[in-house]
Amino acid sequence: MKYQKKVISDLNLCYSLAELTYKGKHCFLVAAEKHDPCYLFDEAGTKIAEPWAGPGGVMTMQQVPEHDGQFLATHEFYSPNDSKNARIIICTPDEEGKWDVRTLVDAPFVHRFGILKRNGIHYLIICCLKSGHEYKDDWRFPGGVYAAVLPENLDDFDENNQLKLVKLKDGMLKNHGYCATTIDGVECALVTCDEGVFLFTPPESPAEQWEIKQLLDVPASDAVICDFDSDGKLELGIIEKFHGDVLSIYRINDHGKYEKCWEYPEKLEMLHAIWAGTLCGKKRFVVGNRRGNRKTIAVSWEAGEYQTEIIEENTGAANILHFMNK
């Protein structure tokens, strides 16, 4: 593939990325992981708004379905050692271009979240890295996954009237990764932690239970799911261990279990950015690491084997957004 890099702005510790429809136009959000702003860009890469100047600590953002310009975001998750005050906020623009930021729900240690739809109902699913913290690198308190039906109108929610969450699963140490996907026409999500890779599927109706299925028992920081080799079966692309250095792909064997079929030949310190999908007409697995050689790598199935291509070095991508002009 041929690549062209375009620097559109500067943002200290740029971290979170998300698409946003704003005033009917296709845009994207960029926010910082520390005490820095959030910016909104149009398709051309021109900065058109600053939804907030702080407080930062933004791990995830996602547009509220069917609401122009309105989106949810995490605030005040600054690191695994500084995220007790983390929460999910609602950010809403007005006609004059000002942005209102209100609390949707306090969620200590919330790192990732997503909005999934099934049978016309939207569900908020949130993933908390841990459940308690008393000193640096304290991992005694595993995280968990929580959910709620997301109402169509969020106007009544604020710090004093928060969305009620239900615990779906606990005991998830270093609950770091989240990846929304669609399997057999149903929106669902991969969630990864030291206990492995889990698939969460919303219920057919709010009165029913979520389906939770463990796909793999290998400790994982992040995962994606995609039919990389076009054999009709979904492979798992994995970053092994929390902020680990092993990049691998797992395939389904004849017994219906995932087994490793490929591993990148060198260690990549602090693997973090991860994405999978169709890029330039081919299924690709794109990843980046934040320390050491700080590569961005594309993996694809070519001539009966997995081949890799280095997109960039010495950059340290934190996350990846596949953004196509409409």
Where are these regions (language model features)?
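Beta-propeller-forming repeat regions
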Residues: M1-K326
